[in-house]
Curated annotation (Swiss-Prot):
The gene is pyrI. The lineage of its organism: Archaea, Thermoproteota, Thermoprotei, Thermoproteales, Thermoproteaceae. GO terms for molecular function: metal ion binding. Contains catalytic and regulatory chains. One of its GO terms (biological process) is 'de novo' pyrimidine nucleobase biosynthetic process. This is Aspartate carbamoyltransferase regulatory chain.
Amino acid sequence: MSKELIVSKIENGTVIDHIPAGRALAVLRVLGITGKEGARVALVMNVESKKLGRKDIVKIEGRELTPEEVNIISAVAPTATINIIRNFEVVRKFNVTPPEVIRGRFKCKNPTCITNAPREPVEPTFYLVRREPPLFVCAYCGRYHELGDLV
């Protein structure tokens, strides 16, 4: 493996590292990043990792994630590490942790759940019932959702 950078360093922003291989697009989706926001986003998929074997990396220039955004990432990438970058240096580094409650970010996979009824203005709500690996339950129908279900 070459030691050269695949993607250049960012001056200020957030680097999301140790994303399980193939999950970077799901991370962008839960963060609501479509590419139309104007921020420069770099996405690297399936790079070698000592920790995971293979991993994805997302770099977001000029944006520091909020604590809510950081923790929502754990629903799709529980091994992710967040690096806050200022002046090309890592000023904070931490792991994601699953939130106790998720509201309005995901759809319940149960097609008969009240949250999926077109005329019912019910916000999907999920409660964390297990941290490792993350397991959530729908507050309305009781369906359990594992990693990857909430995308």
